[in-house]
Regions:
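Adenylate-forming
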Residues: 139, 173-202, 231-241, 257-263, ...
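Conserved AMP-binding
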Residues: 1
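Conserved adenylate-forming
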Residues: 12-14, 19-129, 218-220, 231, ...
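C-terminal boundary motif of the adenylate-forming
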Residues: 165, 204-230
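Conserved C-terminal "lid"/linker of ANL adenylate-forming enzymes
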Residues: 184, 209-214, 249-286
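Conserved ATP-binding/catalytic segment of the ANL
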Residues: 119-122, 126, 131-186, 191
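Ser/Thr-glycine-rich phosphate-binding loops at phosphate-binding pockets of nucleotides
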Residues: 95-99, 162, 187, 276-278
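Residue-level signal for inorganic ion chemistry
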Residues: 39-42, 125, 172, 201, ...
Length: 286
């Protein structure tokens, strides 16, 4: 739905030339010939594109690219900086299939690097126990043939329960802080989103991806983190130096966190995480 509405129908609406990428990775090699002015990508493909652009230079885009619109997962701030250095704006948004694409988005002239942007016209957002609820004419009418699941997701007065946790700042910018299904219950009874702890790590240019989870040390429940390095940042470094860097990074971030939120176990991955077709890390399969 994200690709159909934001890319395909959006291009038709403004009368733009549209290129369909049936094989996204193969299409990247054709960018110099296509010369796009805008790309609509999930963050995982943004990561790949950034790596290729670093290898071949900004001309890899074809010389005309001005904007990348990304959704479906949080966009690491370091990726935004990579593209900004090449003169390309990476704009993040938020939405879901049930709301027919994006509900919030950053604009060229009104953006915040850690945010999914402001609410689009004709839509409403409210927070119920920190869960994001969405209402508008774009909201679906229900799951076909599944009234039970529809009743769980869609309220009688038209609000979609997103299952996502978030907040909005005083300027109207929205932030995604986690998923209800990912909540961990700490020994003190507190609910904690792993995404809340992962966020500071994603601000480091050395972290490509990470996962926080519950673990144990000698039978004691602790928080653990797995980190996938952004290896181009460690060119010429040994693996011991890479792991030492992340041990120090964990110490530095732990110093900013409440004691109950601190990471006690660290592992650094040489292999990628298992991912979905949209390049999202599969949290419960790694």
């Amino acid at each position: 739905v994200f690709g159909l509405i934001r890319s395909t129908l959006g291009a038709f609406y403004v009368g733009a030339t549209w290129f369909s990428a049936e094989d996204a990775k193969a299409t990247m090699g054709k960018l110099p010939a296509i010369k796009p002015t805008m790309l609509v990508l999930v963050p995982g493909l943004c990561e790949i594109l950034a790596g290729l652009a670093k290898m071949y230079g900004p001309q890899f885009f074809g010389g005309e690219l001005k904007t990348i619109i990304s959704g479906a997962a949080n966009v690491p701030p370091r990726l935004m900086k990579v593209f900004e250095a090449m003169g390309v704006r990476l704009l993040a948004g938020y939405g879901m299939t049930e709301t027919a694409n994006l509900t919030t988005g950053n604009a060229d002239t009104d953006t915040h690097p850690d945010s999914v942007g402001k609410v689009y016209p004709e839509q409403e957002i409210k927070f119920v126990d920190d869960e994001i609820w969405i209402r508008g004419d774009n909201v679906f009418s229900g799951y076909y043939g599944d009234p039970e699941e529809t009743a769980k997701t869609l309220t009688p007065d038209g609000w979609v329960r997103s299952g996502d946790l978030g907040r909005m700042d005083e300027d109207g910018f929205g932030y995604i802080t986690g998923r209800i299904k990912n909540l961990m219950i700490l020994p003190n009874g507190e609910n904690l989103s792993p995404e809340e702890i992962e966020g500071p790590f994603y601000k480091s240019p050395t972290v490509r991806d990470c996962l926080v989870s519950e673990s144990e040390i000698d039978g004691e429940p602790v928080l653990a983190i797995e980190i996938l390095p952004n290896m181009p940042a460690f060119e010429g470094k040994s693996w011991d130096e890479v792991t030492a860097h992340f041990e120090q990074l964990v110490k530095d971030i732990n110093a900013t966190l409440p004691s109950t939120h601190r990471i006690r176990k660290v592992s650094v991955r040489k292999e990628d995480f298992k991912r979905s077709g949209a390049m999202k890390v599969l949290r419960n399969q790694n």
